[in-house]
């Protein structure tokens, strides 16, 4: 560990050093000159090692969500624990990742062996893994010994936000203990047990935010270990705030990922409730209303009780442009509204059967706030994560009396005729079958040739 050890050695009145042949020799700024040491003790002993943590289904699901947010060529920083370990395993399909992190672990070594971590596209210290501390197995220490591809530096360099911000696609990934509905994060201690001291988490959160195409991701299970307490709370109490709400962007639980950047307090509350454990959403909703985070007239949408169907997510490429297909969430209300306003008059009539000129938020909430079973809305989006815009919508609303669902679609003009409608109806059909729905009903004008052609192209019986 170079971390703060080098600074301590440079500042201390008396410096004692142990010479241990088991200690790996690392490059970088990890040396103390013998003339600066007052006492030398020669003593060999095994180094502290830690093994792999127990497998966790929660951690594996969170890891899959996070892996979708990490692009090829990203430089990553990641914390310690079960979930970060699962995240590193989930990144095994990526290419040309780089490492600039506090903690070097066995998972980094494994990704280097697989060729996932190359450090070729970092922008700073290219070709080098940069860290300040290593903790892992004996194999990790052997891997580090005299390895020219690994350099250790003190915390004043590794944790410097200005240095972190110089990296290409810098992604910080850290574990939060608790987050409140405004976005304030507690991460370093339990109430009344403030033993862990300061962390470097905020340094990486801010450095990643300043980096070009950088991202800050916070991960946490939705509940504590016994499932009796939500880790998403209305207001943090008796707990130190490690990350202010103004610095928080992506938050990920096993129930999904949300981006809080640029969101109002009400939008933040809705977003975080949507990824809380379903058993606590009702309580959080009513507490948020009482705390003034949600307006009094807001109702508890069914989507806050539904389980987000992550299996319906898909990324496709159309004419060289990446499109993300995914179910709508409560925080999509504004972008769905913007999509409808961007439609031309003809497309508005095709979708709503009259010249509709106003799309009130109350109406749009019926599209974005869904239960994913009786009603489902799929969105096609383009753009960077957190700033994507809707270019296509496919939705169904279930009629239990007929065991049929009514479907409707709208596609932005520049994306019409590119197959988005087929993708949306294929995924809607698969979801409907899984939910036991017998078929679809669609109402359209006889002049809407593109919609008629779409339905006739499907491998379904058309009546």
Regions found by a protein language model. Give the residues of each.
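Flexible domain-boundary/linker segments
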Residues: 87, 125, 161, 200, ...
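Conserved phosphate- and dinucleotide-binding cores of soluble alpha/beta proteins
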Residues: 1-299
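Long, contiguous binding/interaction regions
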Residues: 307-463
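Long, charged amphipathic helices and adjacent flexible linkers at domain junctions
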Residues: 53, 297-315
């Amino acid at each position: 560990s170079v971390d703060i050890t080098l600074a301590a050695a440079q500042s201390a009145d008396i410096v004692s050093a142990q010479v241990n042949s088991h200690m790996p020799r690392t490059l970088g700024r990890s040396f103390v000159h013998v003339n600066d040491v007052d006492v030398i003790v020669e003593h060999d002993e095994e180094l502290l090692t830690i093994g792999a943590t127990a497998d966790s289904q929660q951690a594996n699901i969170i890891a899959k969500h996070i892996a979708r947010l990490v692009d090829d060529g990203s430089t990553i920083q990641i914390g310690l624990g079960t979930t970060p370990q699962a995240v590193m395993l989930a990144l095994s399909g990526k290419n040309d990742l780089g490492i600039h992190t506090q903690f070097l672990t066995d998972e980094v070594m494994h990704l280097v062996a697989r060729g996932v971590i190359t450090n070729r596209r970092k922008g700073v210290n290219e070709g080098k893994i940069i860290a300040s501390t290593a903790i892992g197995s004996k194999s990790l220490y052997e891997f580090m010994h005299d390895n020219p591809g690994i350099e250790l530096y003190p915390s004043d360099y590794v944790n410097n936000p200005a240095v972190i911000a110089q990296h290409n696609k810098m992604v910080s990934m850290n574990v939060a203990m608790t987050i409140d509905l405004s976005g304030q994060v507690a991460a370093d201690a339990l109430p009344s047990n403030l033993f862990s001291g300061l962390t470097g988490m905020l340094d990486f959160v801010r450095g990643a935010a300043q980096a070009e195409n950088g991202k800050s991701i916070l991960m946490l299970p939705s509940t504590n270990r016994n499932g009796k307490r939500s880790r998403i709370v209305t207001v943090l109490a008796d707990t130190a705030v490690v990350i202010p709400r103004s610095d928080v962007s992506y938050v990920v639980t096993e129930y999904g990922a949300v981006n809080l950047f640029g969101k109002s307090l009400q939008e933040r509350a809705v977003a975080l409730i949507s990824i809380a454990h379903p058993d606590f959403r009702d309580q959080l909703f009513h507490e948020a209303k009482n705390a003034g985070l949600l307006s009094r007239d807001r109702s508890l949408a069914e989507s806050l009780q539904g389980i987000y169907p992550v299996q319906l997510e898909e990324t496709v490429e159309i004419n060289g442009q990446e499109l993300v297909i995914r179910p709508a969430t409560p925080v999509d209300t504004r972008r769905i509204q913007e999509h409808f306003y961007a439609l031309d008059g003809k497309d508005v009539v095709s979708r709503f059967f009259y010249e509709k000129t106003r799309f009130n938020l109350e109406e749009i909430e019926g599209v974005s706030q869904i239960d994913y079973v009786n009603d489902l809305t799929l969105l096609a989006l383009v753009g960077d994560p957190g700033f994507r815009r809707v270019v296509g919508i496919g939705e169904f609303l279930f009629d239990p009396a007929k065991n049929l669902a009514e479907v409707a679609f709208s596609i932005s003009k520049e994306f019409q005729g590119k197959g988005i409608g087929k993708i949306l109806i294929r995924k809607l059909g698969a979801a409907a079958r899984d939910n036991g729905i017998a078929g679809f009903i669609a109402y359209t004008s006889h002049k809407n040739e593109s919609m008629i052609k779409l339905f006739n192209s499907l491998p379904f019986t058309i009546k």
